[in-house]
Amino acid sequence: MMVESASETIRSAPSGQNGVGSLSGQADGSSGGATGTTASGTGREVTTGADSNGEMSPAELLHFQQQQALQVARQFLLQQASGLSSPGNNDSKQSASAVQVPVSVAMMSPQMLTPQQMQQILSPPQLQALLQQQQALMLQQLQEYYKKQQEQLHLQLLTQQQAGKPQPKEALGNKQLAFQQQLLQMQQLQQQHLLNLQRQGLVSLQPNQASGPLQTLPQAAVCPTDLPQLWKGEGAPGQPAEDSVKQEGLDLTGTAATATSFAAPPKVSPPLSHHTLPNGQPTVLTSRRDSSSHEETPGSHPLYGHGECKWPGCETLCEDLGQFIKHLNTEHALDDRSTAQCRVQMQVVQQLEIQLAKESERLQAMMAHLHMRPSEPKPFSQPLNPVPGSSSFSKVTVSAADSFPDGLVHPPTSAAAPVTPLRPPGLGSASLHGGGPARRRSSDKFCSPISSELAQNHEFYKNADVRPPFTYASLIRQAILETPDRQLTLNEIYNWFTRMFAYFRRNTATWKNAVRHNLSLHKCFVRVENVKGAVWTVDEREYQKRRPPKMTGSPTLVKNMISGLSYGALNASYQAALAESSFPLLNSPGMLNPGSASSLLPLSHDDVGAPVEPLPSNGSSSPPRLSPPQYSHQVQVKEEPAEAEEDRQPGPPLGAPNPSASGPPEDRDLEEELPGEELS
């Protein structure tokens, strides 16, 4: 039925166009001779037109191609119709012609035959063969046309030289430029035809097929900037311009039998290449853009590192980059889930940028302040209740003038150690990074409730590798309160930590020791035995017993309240930055006497909010002197052992009396954590 309709279409079409006779009666199997005759006839027509006019426009050349395509398409349809209608024909001829397409069919254009008819007539292998033969024949005709034009130019040069009237080189250059522009237009028409075929779904080019015949088109002659070099007499004196063109690699006088045997000139046109986007959508790009994308990422990918996928929440192991690219195209294609993850990552980046802007502004203000003379300080010196009779306890003077650089007026130093986040020469790296939990307690006591914070930034903590600014006790309590029956096993608490926070998923599991430590330490967590085993509940009254801490009560709570009020604005990044940027005056030997240097040794750089008891130094029994009040304001804080020391040693070190040890164990800070638990 399909072949009959095609035959009726061909018979009803006009057959007497431009001297081309009807071929409806030629239904026999002589396709090879007819094809060869047609191709040679078309070549003669092109040659005759070129000889008569001297130049041929792209429209005329396209007109010849359309005529030839119409004629051969009719012949091809009639041959197939006759082959299918006569079952007595041998099947070997049909199998041989299944892939082979007559050469002249390659000149078919979308205006002559619709895509639906091409899909009905030709199989996919025939479409591939059709495209290749079309490119080969187009290239062959272009090269013949180019050869004729060069021969005409050569003859004109010889005749003008013999007549003694040399034509100006500018005129020859303009003529050559016009001819090259015609070639470029033909090449663009061919590329547009290929793209139209691909958009209509008729053909899917492989990269080697797409870049094969197109590379043989002469691109060096298309560039107008190369024309002045061609006409500057680069050849021998008296040599015609045609020979100089040949030296540039543009000699196309030698013809080849097939289009596949053409040698590529030095400069070739950019081939079409298929580049697959990461979400699996193919697109057609030029080789220049494709090569630039490969130069940016020669052997790496931003989402691939250490053998695993860095897509948020994925962590799929991939052996090499090729397997990762395959995983990226299949698992993280353009869908709703990936789009939502991208939106979450955008929010993470925005929050980090806002935080970075705030910290940068704070740093600029600090640097501007440290390079200026201090203004008149407001006196604020109110000593807290020191314990009388304990000679080993020293006063810590917090002075704003302790941070001044060289060249500024500085108050005289005393035997007391100034609480500044500097790094003494004898302080090791272990003590610098050992007080991580302490630097978060002061700010955590006065922040918003953990439930509202987690509700607002749930996606942020779930996907970003950022440690949550909460204590383990508050996190354990929140995990238990979120359950309907208000009880969890230890394994369920671990699962809540890893489910809610990406930090605990991606770091080492030392935090589990801290969870167990806090569960056994605080009286608010009650262990209950039931049918499932041991579960943990929260005694809310016990948890809220000392929150917020009151000024009257344990000296530890008083110390934490004052340190939180004084240094609540100093977060971890601020103190770490100050510790690394050591000023010359603070590191000078004149800043620290032997007593203050020895008392600084057990201090870590981030224990501003929780001072540690210093080691006794020589002559430290006498009370230290205070800094002059006209230069600084002092906050005198009684030093106590750090909470980490309380966890390891209940008694005070070196025989010093510990007031907090005399009280009951529940007077300890509720937010006490495992010592040295800070994760890298």
Curated annotation (Swiss-Prot):
GO terms for biological process: regulation of transcription by RNA polymerase II. Residues 668-680 have a biased composition (Acidic residues). Residues 287-298 have a biased composition (Basic and acidic residues). InterPro entries: FH_FOXP4, Fork_head_dom, FOXP, FOXP-CC, TF_fork_head_CS_2, WH-like_DNA-bd_sf, WH_DNA-bd_sf. The leucine-zipper is required for dimerization and transcriptional repression. Forms homodimers and heterodimers with FOXP1 and FOXP2. Dimerization is required for DNA-binding. This is Forkhead box protein P4.
